[in-house]
Amino acid sequence: MINNVVLVGRMTRDAELRYTPSNQAVATFSLAVNRNFKNQSGEREADFINCVIWRQQAENLANWAKKGALVGITGRIQTRNYENQQGQRVYVTEVVAESFQLLESRATREGGSPNSYNNGGYNNAPSNNSYSASSQQTPNFSRDESPFGNSNPMDISDDDLPF
């Protein structure tokens, strides 16, 4: 049997982080996932999918992913049921996320330019743009920085392409 879920969507609210009596971290959140088609009025609808994540991943999600963040998750579908205060049986279907990944940079989420150079996360740090073979330095690209952000378009003729 296979029970595997992969979702990419935006968080509809900040994750709610709680701890079980045995001190296990658990976070609940929901993702708005766009459908692949448009409705009759030409608008793209979204599904709002309830998710839960456990342990260290729950703490990381609660600390780093906020409402509106574009998140990718992998996990599985789980159904459970309980009896509510009115004595009725309630069935819940949710995705148990086993891992997550933030899919956009912090600068993009906070309204900045994703291609802006930020000196590897150190503001106002002097930059050393000279590289010598003996220095053994590698460029320090931060997570938010594109190494090709300041490049110019290449001038290639069709004759130079191998296909």
UniProtKB/Swiss-Prot annotation:
What GO molecular-function term can you cite, just one? single-stranded DNA binding
- Could you tell me which residues belong to the region Disordered? 106-163
Q: Which segments constitute the SSB domain? A: 1-104
Q: Which InterPro entries match?
A: NA-bd_OB-fold (IPR012340), Primosome_PriB/ssb (IPR000424), ssDNA-bd (IPR011344)
Which Pfam families does the entry link to? SSB
Transmembrane stretches, start-end: none
Q: Which keywords belong to this entry?
A: DNA damage, DNA recombination, DNA repair, DNA replication, DNA-binding
Write out the biased-composition intervals (Low complexity). Answer: 111-135
- Motif Important for interaction with partner proteins extends across 158-163
One GO term of the cellular component aspect?
Answer: nucleoid
Annotated GO biological process = DNA recombination; DNA repair; DNA replication
Q: Which NCBIfam families match?
A: PRK07275.1, ssb
Q: Quote the function comment for this protein.
A: Plays an important role in DNA replication, recombination and repair. Binds to ssDNA and to an array of partner proteins to recruit them to their sites of action during DNA metabolism.
Its subunit composition reads: Homotetramer.
Name of the protein in question: Single-stranded DNA-binding protein 1
Q: Which gene encodes it?
A: ssb1
